């Protein structure tokens, strides 16, 4: 590939190397005049003049002028909106060749913003330009479209800032097609070769600036089979994080469970086959999901099998174990097809590397993890707060002490899918226990982890051919830390979870890979891959030969500056370089009239004149050609190195996953050691015994007072606790802390308590508060009843059920009757471990009829008219809710509070009769 002047900006010039046998200046200049040396001549020449290893620089040795960093505009401003607002309005035959090519590409991607590379900018035209200018607040300008057409809308962004602008478009729910230049010099009279190199969608982005570092970016695909006769609604789901290589599939039944699973996954994008007559957004699809539809063919069984076989280069799918999940297999095939259609051209990718390296799909079964429906996740505020969706105030915020992005993602996955296997839980506990007890080891590991890069995503970018030089250096740095981490663990842990083996028995090829990166790349390479300055000297003889030639040219330039100073009699003359205008001789305005006759004026500025000479102009072309060859050779060497790293992406990721898990465990140990936590005793019983337990989030948010700890006992003799007490006394907080401690224990963490015994739960259900669902046409009461029905249909004797009021949104006796019946069913038929907070004090009577029901209350202290909340849970049922006192504390006007007391007294005296309006009370009507 030939490079043009655009590729040549920057320089490989460095300080001249001292030579053992110094040559005369004339000999150096004579050699530099030869710019047509063959590759073999350059290699031979590099052996005669070996280079001392140093970090090459991409900055020209000739000083840059003050304007050299400015971006050149590629179009004139036009304040009038151009007439052609859509590409379909234009006859392509009338367009210029470039715009005709743009329209051809746009026709293939009508639903995407098309960014078309023109020089230093990515440009949009027609409707895309109008949309781009509005969304990103860019100037809408125009470009000549051809004879009889005039100017068409145009807007663009600098190529070096394209990632930032694309990220903003993705956040607006758009996808972007990138058309890049595939060559740097076109044939005479022809356009530069350009094509779509990648398509950016919410689920397929790889660039660091478009991803959230501490959470997965899931792309999901779904295949559904509606219920027919006795056949239930079935679905298969595949979800992949293309940045980390994770690929999971599952197959289950029920549209409600699909909705719940998608809500829990929080995928960035969902792909599905669009069938004729079907709704564009089915009822089971959460409203906030970015939905992409495809043709049905990629989701067919034969096509999906073919796609999987080709992607993983297999002869059979038997080893993947997909026979029992045919719908999930079809979803996986559709997902891989979508990735193939949206990823870059595999120009420099060896046949053995997939353009988008994903691990073999891992089947996730329904019983693999603790089930948390969307309502429970929201009520327990696992990853964001219920009120405003903020991270601070969530459980993850309270326990996340990870030091790496991959560790944070790992901990998030653990919290979203706690374990059911007691053996796996104890394996995590064992590491946490040792790290809590061994403070020096914990702190040492944290020191090693703190500077660790995101190896998981870095390996993915390298495998996909997207990584830059700095990212390869970061990979080398991370790999070099792995043996030291492993050594720390070998000396400390007698037993460890099996997944840590990928760190403890490190792939021996990885240290060699890191050494290869260090040998070739400088420590702080430039961001650009096309301007040189990436590789060390002595990496490649051809590159060394080119650099020697460039050093000779540098010597000539330095000598030319001295020579022209003498000829002009101007000691202040400077030979400089401009990215646009090339090399020139700069003199002040006062000296401009005294320059030699052979100088040619190149540019006039306010304070100086710029000139060239015939020799300088000739030499400039030679320098550009040499620099282009050197830059191209460096890029070729870099691509070879990146390919070498990409082939090891799987090994790097395995080690990275082990580091991520270790980071999560070290963080949990830090929380436990500094937060007065205890190690829970985990077993397969139904018991939940907590001594002086606390809410892990609320205790960190309290500043002026201490958290009041309480006990919990469920599952041994008591299955259901009826919890009564005043409004705002802490009943909801008590319910949530029970659920969070159960969850933390099954993650493998210590818990905020003095002592804990936790029997493994299969599901956690919560019903805490309700609001109208106006979009679905449901009142608060109907929402509450739907949530209650879900619990009663799916809870088992191993479930933990946390209820905060049932039956409030209807008549008192109706609500009480429902609450009583639900409590009876939970205690007798399901025997779920349940805590039911209520203001129906009549429910205290259940304990007299059922031996597995107990009454508890949240204590308050009355001092005159004042009410002090003690936040202490004690045995026995309350007989008052103190609602009026709570209203007064909330700031309800005093006259309303006093009237409420009168009404309450009257109701208590007269039973259920309606209180009369006091005779002294008058009604003020508006005039």
UniProtKB/Swiss-Prot annotation:
Region called Disordered, residue ranges: 44-80
Gene Ontology, cellular component aspect: cytosol
Keyword DNA damage among record annotations: yes
Ranges annotated as biased composition (Acidic residues): 67-79
Molecular function terms, GO-annotated: ATP binding; ATP-dependent DNA damage sensor activity; damaged DNA binding; mismatched DNA binding
Swiss-Prot/TrEMBL keywords: ATP-binding, DNA damage, DNA repair, DNA-binding, Nucleotide-binding
GO terms classed as biological process: mismatch repair
Keyword flag DNA damage: yes
Top-rank lineage group of the source organism: Bacteria
Residues the record lists as binding ATP: 725-732
Task performed by this protein: This protein is involved in the repair of mismatches in DNA. It is possible that it carries out the mismatch recognition step. This protein has a weak ATPase activity.
NCBIfam families xref list: mutS1 (TIGR01070), PRK05399.1 (NF003810)
Similarity comment: family membership: Belongs to the DNA mismatch repair MutS family.
Protein known as: DNA mismatch repair protein MutS
Native organism taxonomy: Bacteria, Bacillati, Cyanobacteriota, Cyanophyceae, Synechococcales
Gene: mutS
């Amino acid at each position: 590939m030939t490079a043009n002047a655009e590729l040549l900006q920057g320089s490989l010039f460095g300080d001249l190397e001292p030579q053992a046998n110094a040559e005369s200046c004339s000999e150096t200049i004579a050699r530099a005049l030869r710019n047509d040396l063959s590759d073999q001549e350059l290699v031979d020449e590099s052996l005669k003049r070996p280079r001392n290893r140093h970090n090459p620089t991409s900055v020209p040795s000739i000083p840059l002028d003050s304007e050299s960093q400015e971006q050149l505009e590629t179009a004139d401003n036009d304040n009038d909106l151009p007439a052609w607002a859509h590409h379909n309005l234009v006859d392509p035959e009338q367009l210029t060749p470039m715009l005709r090519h743009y329209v051809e590409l746009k026709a293939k991607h009508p639903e995407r913003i098309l960014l078309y590379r023109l020089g230093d900018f990515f440009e949009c035209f027609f409707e895309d330009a109008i949309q781009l200018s509005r969304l990103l607040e860019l100037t809408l300008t125009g470009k000549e479209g051809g004879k009889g057409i005039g100017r068409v809308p145009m807007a663009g962004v600098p190529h070096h800032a394209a990632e930032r602008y694309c990220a903003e478009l993705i956040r607006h729910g758009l996808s972007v097609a990138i058309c890049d230049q595939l060559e740097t010099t076109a044939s005479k009279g022809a356009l530069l070769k350009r094509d779509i190199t990648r398509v950016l969608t919410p689920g397929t982005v790889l660039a660091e600036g478009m991803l959230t570092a501490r959470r997965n970016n899931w792309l999901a695909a779904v295949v559904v089979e509606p219920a027919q006769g006795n056949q239930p609604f079935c679905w298969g789901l595949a979800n992949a994080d293309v940045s980390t290589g994770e690929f999971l599939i599952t197959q289950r039944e029920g549209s409600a469970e699909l909705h719940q699973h998608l809500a829990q996954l929080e995928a960035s994008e969902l792909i599905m086959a669009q069938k004729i007559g079907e709704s564009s957004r089915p009822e089971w699809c959460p409203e906030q999901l970015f939905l992409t539809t495809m043709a049905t063919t990629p989701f067919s069984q034969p096509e999906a099998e073919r796609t999987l076989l080709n992607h993983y280069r297999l002869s059979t799918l038997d080893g993947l174990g997909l026979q029992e999940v045919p719908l999930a297999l079809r979803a996986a095939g559709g997902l891989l097809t979508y990735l193939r259609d949206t990823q870059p051209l595999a120009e420099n990718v060896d046949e053995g590397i997939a353009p988008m390296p994903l691990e073999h799909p891992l089947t996730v079964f329904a019983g693999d993890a603790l089930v948390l429906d969307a309502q429970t996740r929201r009520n327990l505020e696992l990853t964001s707060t219920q009120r405003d969706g903020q991270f601070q105030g969530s459980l993850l915020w309270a326990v996340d002490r990870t030091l790496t992005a991959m560790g944070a993602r790992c901990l998030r996955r653990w919290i979203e899918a706690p374990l059911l296997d007691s053996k796996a839980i104890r394996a995590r506990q064992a590491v946490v226990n040792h790290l809590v007890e061994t403070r020096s080891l914990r702190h040492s590991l944290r020191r090693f982890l703190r500077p660790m890069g995101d190896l998981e995503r870095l390996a993915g970018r390298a495998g996909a051919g997207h990584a830059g030089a700095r990212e390869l250096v970061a990979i080398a740095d991370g790999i070099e830390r792995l043996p030291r981490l492993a050594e720390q663990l070998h000396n400390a842990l007698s037993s460890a979870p099996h997944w840590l083996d990928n760190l403890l028995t490190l792939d021996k090829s990885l240290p060699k890979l890191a050494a290869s990166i260090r040998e070739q790349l400088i420590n702080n390479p430039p961001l650009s891959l096309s301007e040189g300055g990436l590789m060390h000297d002595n990496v490649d003889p051809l590159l060394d030969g080119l650099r020697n030639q460039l050093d000779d040219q540098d010597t000539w330039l330095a000598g030319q500056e001295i020579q022209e100073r003498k000829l002009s009699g101007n000691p202040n003359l400077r030979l400089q370089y401009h990215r646009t205008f090339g090399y020139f001789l700069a003199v002040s305005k006062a000296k401009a009239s005294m320059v030699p006759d052979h100088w040619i004026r190149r540019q006039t500025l306010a304070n100086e004149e710029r000139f060239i000479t015939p020799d300088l102009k000739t030499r400039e072309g030679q320098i550009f050609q040499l620099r282009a060859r050197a830059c191209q050779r460096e890029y070729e060497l870099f691509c070879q190195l990146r390919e070498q790293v990409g082939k090891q992406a799987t090994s790097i990721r395995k080690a990275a996953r082990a580091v991520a898990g270790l980071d999560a465990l070290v963080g949990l140990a830090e929380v436990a050691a500094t937060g007065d936590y205890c190690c829970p005793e985990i077993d397969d019983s139904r018991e939940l015994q907590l001594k002086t337990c606390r809410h892990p989030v609320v205790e960190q948010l309290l500043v002026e007072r201490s958290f009041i700890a309480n006990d919990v006992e469920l599952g041994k003799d008591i299955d259901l606790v009826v919890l009564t007490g005043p409004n705002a006394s802490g009943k909801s907080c008590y319910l949530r802390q029970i659920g969070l401690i159960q969850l933390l224990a099954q993650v493998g963490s210590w818990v905020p308590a003095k002592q804990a015994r936790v029997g493994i739960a299969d599901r956690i259900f919560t019903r805490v508060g309700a609001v109208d669902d106006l979009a679905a046409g449901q009142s608060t009461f109907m929402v509450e009843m739907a949530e209650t029905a879900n619990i009663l249909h799916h809870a088992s004797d191993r479930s933990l059920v946390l209820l905060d009021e049932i039956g409030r949104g209807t008549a008192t006796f109706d609500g009480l009757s429902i609450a009583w019946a639900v409590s009876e069913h939970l205690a007798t038929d399901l025997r779920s471990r349940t805590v039911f907070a209520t203001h129906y004090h009549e429910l205290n009577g259940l304990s007299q009829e059922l031996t597995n029901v107990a009454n508890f209350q949240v204590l308050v202290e009355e001092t005159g008219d004042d009410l002090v909340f003690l936040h202490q849970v004690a045995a026995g049922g309350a007989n008052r809710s103190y609602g009026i006192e709570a209203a007064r504390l909330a700031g309800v006007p005093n006259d309303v509070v006093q009237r409420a007391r009168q009404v309450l007294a009257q109701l208590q005296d007269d039973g259920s009769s309606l209180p009369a309006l006091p005779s002294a009370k008058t009604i003020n009507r508006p005039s």
